[in-house]
UniProtKB/Swiss-Prot annotation:
Protein name: U1 small nuclear ribonucleoprotein C
A single GO cellular-component term on record: commitment complex
InterPro entries reported for this sequence: Matrin/U1-C_Znf_C2H2, Matrin/U1-like-C_Znf_C2H2, U1-CZ_Znf_C2H2, U1_snRNP-C, Znf_C2H2_sf
Family per similarity comment: Belongs to the U1 small nuclear ribonucleoprotein C family.
Record's subunit section: U1 snRNP is composed of the 7 core Sm proteins B/B', D1, D2, D3, E, F and G that assemble in a heptameric protein ring on the Sm site of the small nuclear RNA to form the core snRNP, and at least 3 U1 snRNP-specific proteins U1-70K, U1-A and U1-C. U1-C interacts with U1 snRNA and the 5' splice-site region of the pre-mRNA.
Protein source organism: Aedes aegypti (Yellowfever mosquito)
Role noted for this protein: Component of the spliceosomal U1 snRNP, which is essential for recognition of the pre-mRNA 5' splice-site and the subsequent assembly of the spliceosome. U1-C is directly involved in initial 5' splice-site recognition for both constitutive and regulated alternative splicing. The interaction with the 5' splice-site seems to precede base-pairing between the pre-mRNA and the U1 snRNA. Stimulates commitment or early (E) complex formation by stabilizing the base pairing of the 5' end of the U1 snRNA and the 5' splice-site region.
Coarse class of the protein's main subcellular location: nucleus
SMART domains attached to this UniProt entry: ZnF_U1
Annotated zinc fingers (Matrin-type), start-end: 4-36
Gene Ontology biological process: mRNA 5'-splice site recognition; spliceosomal snRNP assembly
Transmembrane domains' residue ranges: none
Length: 154
């Protein structure tokens, strides 16, 4: 009768029966060996990624650091409005340039101006959903019981 070999533990089990394999796989040593095996595998993958990135950097395929220069500088500096400058339409005189206009009347031919996002929210891109404010709907929080789970059936 063939014996069962455990690759993680590097040992043969006494019998090739489901009960022996189940007992072995639930043991502390086996679980520790499996955990160690996958930790070692992840470390090897990380080292491989580091080596590949280093080789690509040395070959000149990766830029130095695109984020070290900071944001691009604007070409034209707009002076802030002073008390003596006239206000733009919809602005209160002396209001800072970055503030949103307060009074927005109807646009050309009686059309409304476009809707503005609330302060502090970034503009949404195509296909993006608005953020959820109150969490998931109530039916998403309920636990689902399956017919095979006999603990919850009488």
């Amino acid at each position: 009768m063939p014996k069962y070999y455990c690759d993680y533990c590097d040992t043969y089990l006494t019998h090739d029966s489901p009960s022996v394999r189940k007992t072995h796989c639930t043991g502390r040593k086996h679980k520790d060996n499996v955990k160690f095996y996958y930790q070692k595998w992840m470390e090897e993958q990380a080292q491989h990624l580091i080596d590949a990135t280093t080789a690509a950097f040395k070959a000149g395929k990766i830029a130095q650091n695109p984020f070290s220069a900071g944001p691009p500088k604007p070409n034209v500096a707009i002076p802030p409005p002073s008390m003596g400058m006239p206000a733009r339409p919809g602005m209160i005189p002396g209001m800072p340039a970055g503030a949103p206009p307060l009074l927005m009347g109807p646009g050309p031919m009686g059309m409304r101006p476009p809707m503005m996002m609330p302060m502090g929210m970034p503009p949404m891109g195509m296909g993006m959903r608005p953020p959820m404010m109150n969490g998931p709907p109530p039916q998403m929080n309920q636990k689902v019981y399956h017919n095979t789970d006999r603990r919850y059936h009488r």
